């Protein structure tokens, strides 16, 4: 006769629990050996310690002292993940209250242990369906636990226990919540499993249930008081032809495992699906949790877009002053009331001297005067700008019709004039062509030779009337002066504008014998405005980030509540073999998913607000979104999920399996 092999070995096992300042001893020097293929019943009344013993046998708990070995492996000093591995590979649990996951179907519940064992999804599904079919639930695979009777739920629990092979079946009061008929069916299934080679341990207070076992162990007050063989009434059935037994009685082989990487992906997929299921089950709470993230992300993205839009518009207005331009003024600065301000030393020859410098592309002296324009019976006040032929290129003005005056016109003091479209609308309301028409500028007649688009001012659109004539004509025929108001210099792109600015100041100071001029560099203004708007955007964004932090705290609070609500689910997952990292991963993914979806909705809200702002502002200012800010929003929402989701996830991962299972 073949010698039985010891499967579970307990020696001098003691389990104590703290009770105030002292401890209470629940199990007292337990010595027990369970062999492969046994059908054992552990019998005892409430408080006898039988459930504590079952928890230790199933690696859900640890002994305070003593030794417990599974297939010769000492468990007392194993890490939590090592105990989880033993639960996956050796044990299948059948609970009195079934402990099925309410958000999963019957098939989904049965598949859970195989997820953590690294079995392929296809094989998981095939095996779960086969087990449920063999247990008479082939038509109920998609039903939720709430749609099943107590007996059907217990059979799902049995199928789950067998999913990873179930070498040892631990049944805690398996008939306690069932009617008599369902209880008989469950015991029959357990007997068949034992006949097929499974080691079955039944924990019960009912001696009638215990009599189904071939070995009965009685426990009282934490001690084993009896350990005897038993001949059950169904013993004669064990000698029947095994081929006559249902397929469920044949010991199932473990599923094929996959690579560690594929197993990790499967567990991630499972965690992702469970996160979606949990979010869908509490839609309103999930939305309210997301709301802080939505508002925070929308605020940050919108503020950055407003800053970018404002900066872009201001820089476009600066560009209307001319790109790479330096304007030379008389005096020492705006508002200069010194004698230098009254000197009339800035003259056209200064412009000629500047035009010969290698860093200069174009130069235009400028004078101006306000005069009344008359054409037929119409008259209006306009600004007469005396400029050179290069002025239009320097300022980037676009011709709508006609052409500019040339260098000969400047030399010969011609009375040619270029008008802007505002002037055209004022005087040529009938749609006639202004080109070639003569208008009276003050008392000076001038022939229109071109039409330009109006120059945009720094405050937006400008409706003022502007006309342009050769500066020599304006100086001699209108103002009677020899000096110019300012000189606009366009710098060669290959030269630094700051270096060119210093060179201009030095040159004119040398020509005038003193520094009686100052400059305005368009690039310096651009850089100053860019820096200022960036700083303001950063400051306002920092304020908006506060709402993101508040949203993150909201996510953490709700996830802590979720962990509390789902404590029993966590216990079930640990019982079927989930590692601490699996639990941490599941709740962390849920937090990240909440924040990511909140980030997507926040960006969409921001885009909607941008459209509204652009429509309401009607060109006064605009929002300009950047890919960088949107990507940063998603990264930020993900980090919030990780940071604020870690504490709840860590709390979930560190739960004690026994305490989690006992939580209602």
Curated annotation (Swiss-Prot):
The entry's cellular-component GO terms read: plasma membrane
Q: Which domain of life is it from?
A: Bacteria
Q: Name one GO molecular function term.
A: ATP hydrolysis activity
The GO biological-process annotations, alphabetized, read as: response to antibiotic
Gene3D superfamilies named in the record: P-loop containing nucleotide triphosphate hydrolases
**ABC transporter domain spans which residues?**
8-246
Q: Which family does it belong to?
A: Belongs to the ABC transporter superfamily. Macrolide exporter (TC 3.A.1.122) family.
Q: How does it assemble?
A: Homodimer. Part of the tripartite efflux system MacAB-TolC, which is composed of an inner membrane transporter, MacB, a periplasmic membrane fusion protein, MacA, and an outer membrane component, TolC. The complex forms a large protein conduit and can translocate molecules across both the inner and outer membranes. Interacts with MacA.
Please state what the protein is called.
Macrolide export ATP-binding/permease protein MacB
Organism of origin is Acinetobacter baylyi (strain ATCC 33305 / BD413 / ADP1)
């Amino acid at each position: 006769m073949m010698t039985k092999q010891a499967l579970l070995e307990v020696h001098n096992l003691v389990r104590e629990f703290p009770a105030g300042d002292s401890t209470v001893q629940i199990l007292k020097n337990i010595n027990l050996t369970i062999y492969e293929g046994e059908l054992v019943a552990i019998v005892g009344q409430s408080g006898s310690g039988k459930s504590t013993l079952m928890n230790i046998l199933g690696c859900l708990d640890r002994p305070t002292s003593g030794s417990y070995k599974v297939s010769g492996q000492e468990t007392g000093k194993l890490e939590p993940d090592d105990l989880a591995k033993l639960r996956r590979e050796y044990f299948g649990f059948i609970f009195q209250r079934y402990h099925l996951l309410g958000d999963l179907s019957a098939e989904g519940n049965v598949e859970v242990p195989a997820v953590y064992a690294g079995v392929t999804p296809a094989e998981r599904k095939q095996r779960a369906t086969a087990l449920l079919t063999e247990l008479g639930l082939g038509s109920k695979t998609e039903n939720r636990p709430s749609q099943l009777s107590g007996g059907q739920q217990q059979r799902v629990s049995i199928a789950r226990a067998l999913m990873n092979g179930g070498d040892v079946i631990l049944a805690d009061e398996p008939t306690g919540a069932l009617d008599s008929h369902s209880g008989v069916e469950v015991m029959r299934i357990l007997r068949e499993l034992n006949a097929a080679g499974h080691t079955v341990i039944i924990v019960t207070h009912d001696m009638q249930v215990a009599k189904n076992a071939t070995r009965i162990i009685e426990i009282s007050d934490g001690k084993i008081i009896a350990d005897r063989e038993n001949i059950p009434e169904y013993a004669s059935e064990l000698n029947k032809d095994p081929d006559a037994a249902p397929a469920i009685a044949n010991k199932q082989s473990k599923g094929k495992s996959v690579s560690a990487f594929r197993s990790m992906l499967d567990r991630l997929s499972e965690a992702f699906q469970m996160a979606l299921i949990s979010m869908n089950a509490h839609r309103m709470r999930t939305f309210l949790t997301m709301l802080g993230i939505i508002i925070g992300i929308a605020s940050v993205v919108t503020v950055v877009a407003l800053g970018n839009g404002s900066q872009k518009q201001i820089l476009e207005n600066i560009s209307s002053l001319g790109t790479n331009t330096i304007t030379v003024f008389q005096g020492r600065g705006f508002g200069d009331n010194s004698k230098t301000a009254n000197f009339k030393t800035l003259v056209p020859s200064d412009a000629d001297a500047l035009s010969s410098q290698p860093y200069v592309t174009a130069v235009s002296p400028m004078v101006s005067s306000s005069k009344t324009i008359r054409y037929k019976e119409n008259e209006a006040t306009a600004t007469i700008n005396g400029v050179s032929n290069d002025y239009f290129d320097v300022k980037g003005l676009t011709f709508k019709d006609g052409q500019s005056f040339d260098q000969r016109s400047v030399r010969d003091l011609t009375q040619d004039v270029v008008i802007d479209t505002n002037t055209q609308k004022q005087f040529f309301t009938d749609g006639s062509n202004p080109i070639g028409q003569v208008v009276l500028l003050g008392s000076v007649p001038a022939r229109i030779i071109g039409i330009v688009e109006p120059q945009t001012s720094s405050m937006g659109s400008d409706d003022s009337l502007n006309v342009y004539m050769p500066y020599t004509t304006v100086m001699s025929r209108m103002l009677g002066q020899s000096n110019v108001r300012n000189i606009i210099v366009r710098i060669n792109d290959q030269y630094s504008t700051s270096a060119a600015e210093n060179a201009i100041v030095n040159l004119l100071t040398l020509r005038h014998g003193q520094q009686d001029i100052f400059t305005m560099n368009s690039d310096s203004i651009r850089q100053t405005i860019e820096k200022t708007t960036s700083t303001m955007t950063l400051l306002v964004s920092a304020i908006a980030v506060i709402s993101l932090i508040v949203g993150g705290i909201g996510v953490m609070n709700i996830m802590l509540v979720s962990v509390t609500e789902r404590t029993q689910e966590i216990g079930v997952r640990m019982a079927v073999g989930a590692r601490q990292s699996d639990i941490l991963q599941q709740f962390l993914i849920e937090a990240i998913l909440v924040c990511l979806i909140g980030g997507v909705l926040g960006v969409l809200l921001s885009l909607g607000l941008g459209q509204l702002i652009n429509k309401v502002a009607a060109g006064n200012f605009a929002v300009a979104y950047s890919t960088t800010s949107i990507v940063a929003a998603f990264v930020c929402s993900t980090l919030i999920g990780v940071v604020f989701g870690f504490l709840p996830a860590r709390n979930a991962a560190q739960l004690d399996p026994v305490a989690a299972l006992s939580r209602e």
